[in-house]
């Protein structure tokens, strides 16, 4: 079977589908991955066929987009900003994916792009989505995030309450996306988004561990939990020697914010330098935010990109942004994290 994988975003959006692609290859399927050229090298190093998809951005543009996302006050505003960021290339992206779909037997796509299902239906190609966040999976015995829980109320009342909020959130999300991308969808004969939350596809893969969450008795059968899909970049041998020399057989704290970026970095790092105890070793991964310090402190080790598995074996604990990929790696390593 020929499978097309589609995703966009930061490394946390890209790497899980590389892991999925390798699993599909192991099961003797042919796999191609359509995403931005920024990730072409990593995809091809994994032995997966790369397919071009816009945007053809350099890394600094992606960093600016991540910084804009960090400014959003709530999940709905964040989702709207994601679609707003993609307006300049959304039409080209739809056209590109439309051309690739007909060459494949199955499409597995990031949950951000459920509108590609319309294209798959036109070509009679099965379509599935993949999501990295369990908090957007609706069930009447699970209260949506940020909504008060009715603990202590009869189960029937709780179910009505939760179902109401899931339906409302579903409509708000649909309207929010359509308000941004509706004209582009219309120009490609794609109807407005409907049921982004409740019915994104006939199959929605949730790559989160079931053991970490409440087990819903009313989960729609379209949502299937696979556990985390982890992919690690190659080991950096030169950095390995530096880490061994720096740590001297001791585990040390590690700070990493991955591909998240944010405002006022210089002020934040100045406070960090002022308050971090002298002589206490720590590893600081610069990440997409470009974290750094302004003075020479030999007890603070600044490093660039490296795989979680290589880095976290030196960790006493990890302070991180809570991204799905980083959280999965910390849990895999079995170390404390904040």
Task: Tell me what each language-model feature is.
Residues 177-228:
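Long, low-complexity segments enriched in small/aliphatic residues
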Residues 207-317:
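Donor-nucleotide binding loops and adjacent catalytic segments primarily
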Residues 76-83, 140-186:
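Alpha-helical membrane-targeting segments
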Residues 49-104, 155-163, 171:
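Phosphate/nucleotide-donor binding subsite
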Residues 1-51:
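N-terminal subdomain of nucleotide-sugar transferases
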Residues 21, 107-109, 303-338:
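A donor-sugar binding/catalytic signature common to diverse glycosyltransferases
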Residues 34, 53, 110, 128-133, ...:
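Generic beta-sheet signal
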